[in-house]
Amino acid sequence: YISPEIIDFGFEEKWAVIDLIMKQNNNNLPDRTIQYCSKKTPATYCRNVGRRRRWEFSLDKNSVDKEILNDDKIWNFLSKWITPEDATIERKTIYTFKSLIAKKWRKGRVFIAGDAAHLSPPFMGQGMCSGIRDVSNLFWKIAYCCNFGHKEKLLKTYESERLKNVKEYIITTINMGRLLNSIGDTNVSNTVKEEKDGSKKMTSIKPPL
């Protein structure tokens, strides 16, 4: 087996995820995904396929899951947007977002990728994307070694190339999540720096793919 040792970046949050089906089209709801940056209760609204809509909202780490998923509690939270007359609850669950990377991604003929190798908060939508990048990096290397007699050292580049990139994405995602959860706090806003022309600049993820 591969060593279970992990790097923990210390970010862990509970979020409720509520999927609903609208009984009829509600023109008052946004026709796009929106992130509500609130110090009290950060939330996300997703305009999904057809009449499906999703709300996600941050929970206190000491909250009781069973109580949070009570329908009355859910509708109370959603009351600023919709009521039970507008939609039915299709699914309700709680996710715990974590920030972890396995220290070893290979042992002999066994490799790990995706969620088996790393876990990221969802704020940049890069969890599954990173897993796809893992496989895209690895599959052709295995094929070259098995079918064309390439030296095994090629396989060693999988972990060295992917781990650094995933790490940078996770760190950036954590910072994004902290911003969403602290918006309006001067401790956060004062850290935003402007260019000389007054514009704000975001640099690319490093190291590159």
Label the predicted regions.
Residues 1-97:
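Conserved FAD-binding catalytic core of PHBH/FMO-like flavoproteins
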Residues 9, 23, 36-39, 48-49, ...:
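Surface-exposed loop/turn and secondary-structure junction residues enriched for glycine/proline
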Residues 20-24, 28, 40, 67, ...:
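Charge-rich, low-complexity amphipathic helices
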Residues 21, 33, 60, 93, ...:
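Residue-level detector of alpha-helical recognition elements and their boundaries
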Residues 47-56, 88-92, 124-130, 186-199, ...:
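Hydrophobic transmembrane alpha-helix bundles
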Residues 76, 144-209:
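Helical substrate-recognition/capping region of FAD-dependent monooxygenase/halogenase enzymes
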Residues 89, 95-175:
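Conserved mid-domain beta->alpha element of the FAD-binding
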